[in-house]
């Protein structure tokens, strides 16, 4: 009886010690993380006090959210939680995420340029790129008043099977039409100044999922959608009065020939440097620009990479089979100039010392509103402008050796005047480079519309 009572007291004391220790640990501010490596996001900040939020109860609610979101050793605890779930035997099972609702794609529809204008684009006088730790994909956030732009480039659709995750595309007729009109309007604005090229890059699901799976998930045929976009652009150009029409780049046909190669990550929504390399050569051949052979590039590898799709799903199947990142180091161009924090900064074109979990930021220093490379071995005054989202980050190093000047703007954050910029820099080639997801996302389409309105 006595030993039983001692055991009960020991158990109570141990429980109390753990409880008190956890409380004390939770209040040590120096241990509270500001970012989450495993989720790839900035954690909730401690709220600023004001009387209105205090009286409404919002202030105390935000403190509770901050306390829970920034608990010390948060990532370690998440990893342990994932490991425990893996012991349940569910880690490698098929997992279906959000099922979107796609519009019907009519390949035989009539395209009429003159119609009522769409909704006005967002007004963002000083759009801000994501933090150094973040880079994203085409991106569902629509609140343009937020302190930072959206960090996720998804339309909230994903499909996990085994060690691979795919973003799913849901065709939206109005958004795709607005995307096409932006490209054609840019060609009209730049008519006689520069030739406009349009490259819509398929995402990995386009080559990996069967028609049966697409029907089951309600997802759209991405390759057919790209062909539809190019058909619309070709039809709109003469109606709009463009004398130098948009040149469409059917790289989806090229990438289909290499679909069994490592051209997409399994745990991230981006393409790999190899995928960007194939499409860059297709583009450079079309514009008759020289480029180095693949053997002339030094290859640098990050061995372990768990990307945005892992952070989105926290799938054990992905965690057990991480990606790797190959980066091709240009033989001639080592640096890129970016615009960040209101100043121009020189960064490595390929960063060999990325410390964050998001290794994709090694390409062109991640997401910024403006980029510029200079190749001293070419003195012909040639210049290229890339209008891009984050897929363009891996593309910039692939064309840096082919032009004296390569400029790139991320339309999600850049607020300049397109025509004035092209004229000022003497640019004669403009490339719209977007992954398929960007064409059916309201935020990215509205940001694109700012370029031509």
Predicted regions and their residues:
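Extracellular glycan-modifying ectodomains
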Residues: 1-453
